[in-house]
């Protein structure tokens, strides 16, 4: 059974390539050792989605029409998700593993990850309760996911009686942020909420710290993970927080088992583990579980059956012993140099 992994291998999101591909290889090795998917050995095909719809569709067409893959796991930005689903979703299963907006998706897309509202609400409640934060400035990239994250933030801040002090949407290119940083400094915000992708988050946070703002206000960042923090550097992560359903330092038996498999496979020089890679690992196991559930390895049949309303619940149930688990917890982590230390679960703040 040939499974494709479609994700950006360059550009702002390319920094996750090593961890995504390493985690996928661990998942495939684990499944093949247990008999593959219903007796069929799995082989992986890696494909570059690029960062625009044209490149993503060209890659998707090649995967299905030329490579003849039986399923596609997407770990790319959300603006590519619906076009890819529309192009291939009726022919092969399409599983999307990136954190996403929580909006209604195409019927042919099975999304497994947690959503922005699921993360933002407990995080904002915690920031309000524990840090007395009521004034927020938002910075995101200029495409679907950050704009929907900003919409969720505005709604949630309004519900808790807080205030949005300003916002900015940045292109996914390297840029100087002097004017924006002056706006943030003058805004009176307690917290800068970020929805920046990969290298964009690295660049912004380095400049934020260089301007001395890291000593004056908190930063709460979506999808700032172990990879991004390493890129930002130890001198620029003061007062930087993130929340996610997965951090490598979350101490659970499920995660300990995964980390053992991962480091046994790649040793001390393994790419850092992060949610991006773990999502793909779980996507592979979800596909295998649904193939068993529906008693089929036929791509079109699986794609049709996975459109059912119970597929996501069945997939997450099958992941009960995997790192994130059946019912994802939401963890808060604080940067300590170039690591993220999990401080607590914040589900209770929902």
Model regions and ranges:
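Periplasmic-binding protein-like
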Residues: 63-76, 95-97, 137-138, 188-204, ...
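Signal peptide-proximal N-terminal region
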Residues: 23-44
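Extracytoplasmic ligand/sensor domains, especially the bilobed periplasmic-binding protein
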Residues: 69-164, 216-221, 227-234
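Short beta-strand segments enriched in small/hydrophobic residues
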Residues: 1-19, 75-76, 133-140
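Extracytoplasmic "Venus flytrap"
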Residues: 4-25, 49, 271-277
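Segments of small-molecule ligand-sensing domains
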Residues: 265-277, 288-342
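Short, well-structured alpha-helical segments in soluble
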Residues: 46, 50-70, 126, 175-188
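Extracellular/periplasmic periplasmic-binding protein-like sensory domains
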Residues: 208-279
């Amino acid at each position: 059974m040939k499974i494709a992994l479609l994700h950006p291998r360059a550009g702002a999101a390319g920094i996750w390539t090593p961890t995504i591909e390493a985690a996928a290889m661990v998942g495939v090795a684990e499944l093949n050792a247990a008999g593959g998917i219903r007796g069929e050995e799995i082989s992986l095909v890696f494909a570059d989605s690029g960062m625009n719809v044209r490149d993503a569709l060209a890659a998707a067409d090649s995967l299905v029409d030329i490579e003849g893959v039986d399923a596609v796991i997407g770990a790319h930005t959300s603006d590519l998700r619906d076009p890819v689903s529309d192009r291939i979703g009726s022919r092969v299963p399409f599983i999307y593993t990136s954190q996403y907006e929580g909006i209604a998706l195409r019927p042919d897309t099975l999304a497994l990850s947690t959503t922005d509202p699921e993360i933002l609400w407990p995080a904002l409640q915690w920031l309000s309760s524990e840090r007395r934060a009521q004034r927020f400035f938002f910075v995101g990239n200029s495409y679907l996911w950050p704009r929907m994250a900003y919409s969720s933030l505005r709604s949630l801040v309004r519900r808790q009686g807080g205030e949005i002090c300003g916002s900015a949407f940045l292109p996914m290119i390297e840029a100087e942020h002097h004017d924006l940083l002056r706006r943030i400094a003058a805004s009176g915000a307690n917290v800068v909420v970020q929805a920046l992708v990969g290298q964009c988050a690295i660049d912004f946070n380095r400049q934020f710290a260089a301007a001395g703002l890291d000593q004056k206000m908190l930063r709460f960042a979506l999808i700032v993970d172990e990879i991004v923090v390493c890129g930002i550097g130890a001198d620029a992560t003061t007062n930087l927080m993130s929340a996610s359903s997965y951090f490598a330092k979350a101490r659970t038996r499920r995660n300990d088992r995964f980390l053992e498999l991962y480091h046994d496979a790649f040793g001390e020089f393994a790419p850092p583990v992060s949610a991006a890679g773990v999502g793909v690992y779980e996507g592979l196991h979800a596909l295998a579980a649904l193939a068993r559930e529906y008693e089929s390895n036929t791509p079109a049949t699986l794609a049709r059956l996975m459109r059912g309303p119970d597929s996501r619940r069945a997939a997450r149930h099958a992941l009960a012993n995997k790192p994130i688990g059946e019912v994802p917890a939401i963890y808060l982590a604080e940067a300590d140099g170039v690591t993220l230390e999990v401080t607590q679960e914040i589900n209770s703040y929902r």
